[in-house]
Amino acid sequence: MKETGKIYFASDFHLGLNTGTAPLDREKKVVRWLNSVAGDAKEIYLLGDIFDFWWEYRLVVPRGYTRFLGTVSEITDSGVPVHFFTGNHDMWVRDYFSSECGMIIHTSPVTTVFDGKTFHLAHGEGLGTKEKAYKILLAIFRNKTLRAMYSSLHPSIGIGIGHMWSLSSRLGKGLELQFYGEEKEDLLRYSKTVLTKENIDFFIFGHRHLAMKYILKETSEVVFLGDWIKHGSFAEWDGSALNFKMFD
């Protein structure tokens, strides 16, 4: 890994989703962004829902995404770490991304330090939620026995069902998402709970599809990374400041 350079954060590419930007155009845009930051990147963090649906069988992976996966592989081959956080749309990974593409896989939140500042990183699904139905749904998605049963389906059936499920979501239907305020936003509630246990300078989340910063208190800031369905948004740590940017 380089001793100097910038840290980049992005999430919610939803590669393969046929809503908003055309899927192939979105993938090409993501690849252009990766190539544009690779030269001065110390590390790149992809915070979940990179794919709109990803179910990895032991010997079979979903069709497509060759431009993206090839670019990531070139970046990791060059010595730049690329971190992949699973999201609620692509939590069903095995070892393909790590063994073939060189990515570092994270399945839970990570707290780390860059240049003396403490960062808490996560996709964000289920964190701080009070909705019992959503907690049950996530428990089903993560259940090893049920995952093994689903993997017994032929890939054409299993992946086909997954894409239909994704299109039935609010995101798949193209519905707008809104900010609900500090008391009702799950991830802000979660962040405040974390702050009772440790000091965090920056929380960075995906999942909400909101491109925004929120000052939780004088010394703690929350960043929602937005998405690449409409925004093309990302965050950049330059060693002293966290900058929020858009990629055209």
What are these regions (language model features)?
Residues 114-115, 237:
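Structural motif
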Residues 11-14, 49-50, 88-89, 124-125, ...:
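Active-site metal-binding loops of divalent metal-dependent hydrolases
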Residues 2-6, 10, 15-114:
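Core catalytic region of metal-dependent phosphoesterases/phosphodiesterases
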Residues 104-107, 120, 125, 131-137, ...:
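Conserved beta-sheet core of the metallophosphoesterase superfamily
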Residues 52-75, 170-200:
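N-terminal short leaders/motifs
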Residues 124-186:
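Active-site-proximal loop/helix segment associated with metal-binding centers of metalloenzymes
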Residues 5, 117, 220:
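Nucleotide donor/acceptor-binding cores
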